[in-house]
Amino acid sequence: MTDALTRIYVDADACPVKDEVYKVAERHHLPVTLVAGGFIRVPQHPLIERVAAGSGMDAADDWIAERIKPGDIVITADIPLASRCVKAGATAIAPNGKPFTEESIGMTLAVRNLMTDLRSTGEITGGPRAFSPRDRSTFLSALDSAIRRIARRRAAPT
């Protein structure tokens, strides 16, 4: 069992791995907060909380960023939100399992901004590749590893 101080936040509006988060969180007895712009369905479970943050452009992101703390985990494909969470000392993981780290977030943000600019000028017209079963598997492994890493850090003598 992992320290209950760890909470998993899910940027839930378009998250393809919510079911996987529920399963892993239940196995580790961790609370999950799903944050969306509006109402979303979630399973009835004492560890799962649903938050409708409002319809503002970044309402869900702001809600998460204002509450996340070191030792928490956020699941998001939103790179600016991941950056805010990493800066707060949390672990950020994309739904495809890619971790956002202090070392990688700057470059990831720069590439995101470049791609946004290229799309706005018509230089690039395609989007990201489709979500795959391999992405789902990579995500499960990344989430489980992050939870175990946080638990080890908390258990280490200070």
Swiss-Prot record:
Signal peptide: none
Superkingdom as given in the UniProt entry: Bacteria
InterPro entries xref list: UPF0178
NCBIfam families reported for this sequence: PRK00124.1
Family: Belongs to the UPF0178 family.
Protein name: UPF0178 protein Rpal_2485
Organism this protein belongs to: Rhodopseudomonas palustris (strain TIE-1)
Lineage, highest ranks first: Bacteria, Pseudomonadati, Pseudomonadota, Alphaproteobacteria, Hyphomicrobiales
